Amino acid sequence: MASRVNDQSQASRNGLKGKVLTLDTMNPCVRRVEYAVRGPIVQRALELEQELRQGVKKPFTEVIRANIGDAQAMGQRPITFFRQVLALCVYPNLLSSPDFPEDAKRRAERILQACGGHSLGAYSISSGIQPIREDVAQYIERRDGGIPADPNNIFLSTGASDAIVTMLKLLVSGEGRARTGVLIPIPQYPLYSAALAELDAVQVDYYLDEERAWALDIAELRRALCQARDRCCPRVLCVINPGNPTGQVQTRECIEAVIRFAFKEGLFLMADEVYQDNVYAEGSQFHSFKKVLMEMGPPYSTQQELASFHSVSKGYMGECGFRGGYVEVVNMDAEVQKQMGKLMSVRLCPPVPGQALMDMVVSPPTPSEPSFKQFQAERQEVLAELAAKAKLTEQVFNEAPGIRCNPVQGAMYSFPQVQLPLKAVQRAQELGLAPDMFFCLCLLEETGICVVPGSGFGQQEGTYHFRMTILPPMEKLRLLLEKLSHFHAKFTHEYS
């Protein structure tokens, strides 16, 4: 810091104007933000790709991006019906073309009728296009066995991430020991730790139980809450189901216990359910927090506050780039809900193409429509392939000495634990790196495989992990798993 001040003083003496915005004058909360999924490992992967394009010789011919859940970047084909409707919405002159099915045309016409100037390029209202919010409400009702959903409690968003951050902005307040504490699962999706750092909230970690397939334990929630009350005011409990990066699917009994705990302790519940279509393990089933809450009856159904989130980026869709999502709020204070609408209006509106895509996700072709057969086949193919990849990943890792992988019950990732030799840990410390960061960097440099170290998600002290997506095409995934297992054996031998 002193050197930067001296540099500015020297600039002043030389007649040069110093920068107004520096690392010292910028928002300190932003400096604390970290996002491992796009952190140093990924930056190095980009450099390696550039070097390969320039003809630099490497021990590999391509960088395999297994660091992020971007399905289409990994080769997954878009759902035909979704793209047909989007094409019609973007260029309505195609509505007269015989190359598009009639149900796609009807869907596009309905969306365009709800847009300002009948154009996807117009702003929508801040909470999202009304007929699309109505379709989201009907989807939630179907998903939850007829439990009513009110479109006025649904806000469309720029992906689920935007809605999550907006909700946290509403919830975070106070200073000192009165600062809002937010309970998040460890391992966690780094969006949460990054958002809490930016908002200057207190992150309260509760650990998932790796020995029980990343189970959520109420006793652990209670421990985290009690310890946090000495330093903050815990007000929020976040649950990711299915889990990211851990891939577990919560049982109904667990969800009921979490709701009872939140109600008893006066916590606002945030349920991140963007992987609700991604459930693979036999015996596992997705249960929405909204459905369980309502079926529990009063006082839970009438008093427990809940926000649940969904997205077009995951599931079988994989439409990450369109940035479509929604949040449904339950039992929210009416005046606070108005403030939420105000906060969203500052950003004008979510991307309208993303809203249109969300409409197709929640209102896909029905059995009586011409596009249904192809849509259903494409959807089932994607989910069946993901299930096979999840099983393969678990099997290969568990056959490799020094690697242990829990069942990938859902979502799009495996989060295996790796044993690292003491000499490797010591070498990492000499370099100022977390041991699993050192392992992942070495893996990238030697094999071109880009994964994210577990330290970026949080983990029990003394354990090491990495997160790897299961999205690559099957043959590439087999090769990736084989190369990774061989590298770990070589790495272990080298540092033993």
Swiss-Prot record:
Protein localization: Cytoplasm
Modification N-acetylalanine occurs at: A2
Main location as per UniProt: cytoplasm
InterPro entries cross-referenced by the UniProt entry: ALAT1/2-like, Aminotransferase_I/II_large, PyrdxlP-dep_Trfase, PyrdxlP-dep_Trfase_major, PyrdxlP-dep_Trfase_small
UniProt keyword terms in alphabetical order: Acetylation, Aminotransferase, Cytoplasm, Phosphoprotein, Pyridoxal phosphate, Transferase
Catalytically driven reaction(s): L-alanine + 2-oxoglutarate = pyruvate + L-glutamate
Name this polypeptide is given: Alanine aminotransferase 1
